[in-house]
Structure formats: C-alpha cells, structure tokens
C-alpha cells in the first residue's frame, strides 16, 4: 500500500481536491487513515449484500473508487445471475479498480465504467452503494440522483449511503470535527497535512446533517431509513424500498 504524503509539504497554491492520478495511487492508505470506521463499513456492506441481493438482479457501486465496496459485496453474493456495475468519473480510479477486481476470481461478473453517476441508468437493482460519494455532488443534484436510485431499485431493495455528516448543534459539530482531526493525527498525519487537505476539500465536499439525509430519503419514497453506523462525524445509513 502506497503511503499518502500528498499534503506533507507546504503547497503554495492549494487548489480544489480532485481524484486524480496522485490521489488514486495512495487512495487505500488515505481513506483508511482519514475515515474513522471505514473498514467496518466495508465489511458490513458485504453482510448487507448477503441479506439483500436477490437472484437475477444488479448491484450498483456509485463512486466505486478502487473497488473496496464492490469486492466486499461480491465476496458475499451467493445468488445466481447477479451482476455488479461500478461507476466512477475518475479514469485513474477506474483503471486501478479494474486491476484490483481482476486479481480476485469470482463467479459474479463485475463491470467498471468511467462515467458520471448522474448520467447512468439504474435498473433491476437489489442493492445500490453510495459510499462517501453523495457529498461530492452539487447539493442541487442530490434529490434527482436519489430519485433515480429509488426508481431503479426493486421492491425491498436497499441503498447503502455512507457520508461525512455535519451537525446543527455547533458545539457538537466542532467537537466531532476536532475528534476527527485527532484521529488523523493519531494515524500519522501532521497538522500541516490535516490543514491543507481540509482547505482543498472546502469547496468540493458539502456535507448534510443526518436529519437532512433521512428526510430527503423518505421524501424520495424509501419506506425504512436508519443510521446503522457512526464514528465521530462519519457514518452510514440504509434505506429500504
């Protein structure tokens, strides 16, 4: 695993964070050291796939990056005639994802596409995964994407939505942000790295509250919506059609 040192030296002109070749190269290390509970979420995606994925259906991993969630789901799918479609708009991520998927043998076919998830049709889905992806979409595009997902899910299909959250209570919000930064420092990131990455993400990642997510998912049509995992200001929700 290549160590993430992208923000370890001062950057004179710090642009917006993008999922380019450099990020794709270090992404597994970056996300493990940056997102508390990430491994638990990936493991549980496999457990949810085992419960929810049905025969003759599709599974979508929207914003699949290097394929961790796709592989977790794939390892736990035991139903016949299931296909996984992973989509990411970063070509470097897609190339590495394809290599990663090809390294593991499975009877479950996987197709990895380089595309904008807003333009991809969702159909005959028993499971859709949005793992730390929605927060990078413009807020005005989120309802349309979730509506498309809902309409493409079969009855009793599940959406797994993992996100970084913000909190309406300012003191709690600041506390959880501070704890997250402490988590990153404990994982070897310096103050400079934490600060520069935060600045790079400011205009790219726009977070919502848990309540905003719940209301939006229910308004789209999901019958059951619940937070199933949280660590500091990161977590994951399930929404069942």
Curated annotation (Swiss-Prot):
Q: Does the keyword section mention S-adenosyl-L-methionine? A: yes
Query: What Pfam families has UniProt attached to this entry?
Result: Methyltransf_25
One GO MF term attached to the UniProt entry: S-adenosyl-L-methionine binding
Q: What is its EC number?
A: 2.1.3.-
Residues that coordinate or bind S-adenosyl-L-methionine? 38, 63-65, 88-89, 116-117, 131, 198
Q: Which reaction does it catalyse?
A: prephenate + S-adenosyl-L-methionine = carboxy-S-adenosyl-L-methionine + 3-phenylpyruvate + H2O
- Reported function: Catalyzes the conversion of S-adenosyl-L-methionine (SAM) to carboxy-S-adenosyl-L-methionine (Cx-SAM).
What is the annotated quaternary arrangement, including any partners?
Answer: Homodimer.
Q: Which family does it belong to?
A: Belongs to the class I-like SAM-binding methyltransferase superfamily. Cx-SAM synthase family.
What this protein is called in its record is: Carboxy-S-adenosyl-L-methionine synthase
Q: Which organism is it from?
A: Haemophilus influenzae (strain 86-028NP)
Gene that encodes the chain? cmoA
């Amino acid at each position: 695993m290549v160590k993430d040192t992208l923000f370890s030296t001062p950057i004179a002109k710090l642009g917006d964070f993008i999922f380019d070749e450099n990020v794709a190269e270090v992404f597994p290390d970056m996300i493990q050291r940056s997102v508390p509970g990430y491994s638990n979420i990936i493991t549980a995606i496999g457990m949810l796939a085992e419960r929810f994925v049905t025969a003759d259906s599709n599974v979508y991993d929207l914003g699949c990056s290097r394929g961790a969630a796709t592989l977790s789901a794939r390892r736990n799918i035991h139903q016949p005639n299931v296909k996984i479609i992973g989509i990411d708009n970063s070509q470097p991520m897609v190339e590495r994802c394809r290599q990663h998927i090809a390294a593991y043998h499975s009877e479950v076919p996987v197709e990895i596409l380089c595309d904008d998830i807003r333009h991809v049709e969702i159909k005959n889905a028993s499971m859709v995964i949005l793992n730390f992806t929605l927060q990078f979409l413009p807020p005005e595009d989120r309802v349309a994407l979730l509506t498309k997902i809902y309409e493409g899910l079969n009855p009793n299909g599940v959406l797994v939505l993992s996100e970084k959250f913000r909190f309406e209570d300012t003191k709690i919000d600041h506390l959880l942000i501070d704890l997250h930064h402490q988590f990153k420092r404990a994982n070897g990131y310096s103050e400079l790295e934490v600060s520069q990455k935060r600045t790079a993400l400011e205009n790219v990642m726009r977070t919502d509250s848990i309540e905003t997510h719940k209301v939006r998912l229910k308004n789209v049509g999901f019958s059951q919506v619940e937070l199933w995992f949280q660590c500091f200001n990161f977590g994951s929700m399930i929404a069942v059609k």
